[in-house]
């Protein structure tokens, strides 16, 4: 129902929302995450993620979002000062939702005939993961697999930087051991990004089932992945700096795979 209006920042529901915003452990415990803004909430709905509670502030609306409210199990109106207290970021059209987490396993993935998968080992920065998910959506990758993650996949910064791609790209968290076994079982070639003993990325055939493995910017990939690789690949560095941001590197490698596949379809 849409008849409750919260005007106090001391309301228990407001305090609960702030707890969820600030504590990853609390989000995991309740099996929920927080989404802000019309675009991100719409992506949740379109990808069948249940909206548990939708908070809204009419005075911040730039258009009528009543149709969006009808998609939530519960809608609660809040005063502008309350919304500003609850919001993690600005410019969210006065819309914020608690959404039920959808946890995928490797076995839930539905792969195409020649899948293209991004694997991230021990990704640290939420902004990088969000940007990579955005690139994965643009490249129509089959999945992003996060091995031994150091950040919550539904971290508010990941949701924001992915512009909702965290809901459109199948994303799985697992151990490196599980991921390697899965890729080997499905005959998906493993290409590890590293500078040493590697081929230029455009010299490798990525038209077949392919996984691109990215490590951390500080230490790269662990020996476990280097030993599991079918090939090591690198992006040529022509300046004085010997590395790129991991999200930029991932996008370059992803779209080389896309280029090769599109050229093959044209021939």
Regions found by a protein language model. Give the residues of each.
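Boundary-proximal intrinsically disordered activation/regulatory segments immediately upstream
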Residues: 1-62, 150-151
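Amphipathic alpha-helical repeat scaffolds
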Residues: 37, 124-131, 245-249
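RNA substrate-binding interface of SAM-dependent RNA methyltransferases
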Residues: 46, 79, 103-197
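Short, aromatic/basic amphipathic alpha-helical patches
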Residues: 62-72
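Glycine/small-residue-rich loop that forms an oxyanion/phosphate-binding "nest" at active or ligand-binding sites
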Residues: 73-99
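Structured adenosyl-cofactor binding patch, chiefly the S-adenosyl-L-methionine
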Residues: 138-139, 153, 158-165, 223, ...
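Active-site/ligand-binding-proximal alpha/beta "capping" segment
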Residues: 191-241
């Amino acid at each position: 129902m849409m008849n409750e209006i919260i005007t106090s920042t001391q309301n228990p529901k407001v305090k609960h929302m702030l707890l969820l915003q600030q504590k990853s452990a609390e989000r995991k415990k309740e099996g929920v995450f927080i989404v802000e803004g019309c675009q991100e909430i719409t992506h949740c709905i379109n990808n069948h993620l249940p909206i548990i509670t939708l908070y809204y502030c009419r005075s911040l609306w730039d258009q009528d979002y009543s149709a969006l409210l009808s998609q939530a199990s519960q809608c609660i109106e809040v005063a502008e000062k309350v919304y500003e207290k609850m919001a993690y970021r600005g410019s969210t059209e006065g819309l914020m939702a608690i959404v039920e987490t959808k946890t995928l396993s490797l076995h839930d993935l539905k792969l195409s005939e020649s899948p293209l998968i991004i694997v991230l080992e021990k990704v640290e920065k939420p902004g990088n993961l969000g940007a990579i998910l955005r690139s994965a959506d643009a490249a129509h990758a089959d999945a992003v697999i996060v091995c031994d993650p150091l950040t919550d996949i539904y971290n508010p910064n990941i949701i924001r930087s992915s512009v909702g791609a965290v809901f459109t790209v199948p994303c799985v968290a697992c151990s490196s051991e599980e991921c390697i076994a899965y890729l080997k079982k499905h005959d998906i070639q493993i290409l590890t990004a590293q500078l040493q003993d590697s081929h230029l990325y455009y010299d490798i055939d990525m038209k077949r089932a392919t996984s691109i493995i990215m490590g951390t910017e500080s230490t790269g990939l662990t020996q476990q992945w280097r030993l599991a690789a079918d090939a090591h690949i690198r992006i040529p560095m022509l300046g004085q700096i010997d590395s790129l941001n991991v999200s930029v590197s991932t996008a370059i490698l992803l779209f080389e795979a896309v280029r090769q596949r599109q050229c093959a379809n044209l021939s």
